[in-house]
Amino acid sequence: MSSTLIVQLDMRTLCQEADVTAECVIEIVEHGIVEPSGRTPEDWLFDDQAPLVTKRAVKLHQELELEWEGVALALELLQEVQQLRSENNMLKQRLGRFIQM
């Protein structure tokens, strides 16, 4: 029997983990960069990836001086590149099996 641990963070914990203000998190949520469950900021719960995504978003916003819309697009494209690289590696492994035969 296996058990799954689901970690959810409230607004205060996310702000502490990502070292950002609540206003910053609200801005990030408004642009769809992170998507909490819950209707209001007081009720929001974030998954365990939210601190990492939030930190990346803030870094892009500050260091590259991107608007939040640009940050959302950049993060989406970076995720797509990572997914394509993973898929490419998997296909290379499969191809390698056929070539070795």
UniProtKB/Swiss-Prot annotation:
InterPro entries: CbpM. It comes from the Bacteria. Pfam families: MerR_2 (PF13591). Disulfide bonds: none annotated. Interacts with CbpA and inhibits both the DnaJ-like co-chaperone activity and the DNA binding activity of CbpA. Together with CbpA, modulates the activity of the DnaK chaperone system. Does not inhibit the co-chaperone activity of DnaJ. Belongs to the CbpM family. This is Chaperone modulatory protein CbpM. It comes from Pseudomonas putida (strain ATCC 700007 / DSM 6899 / JCM 31910 / BCRC 17059 / LMG 24140 / F1). The lineage of its organism: Bacteria, Pseudomonadati, Pseudomonadota, Gammaproteobacteria, Pseudomonadales.
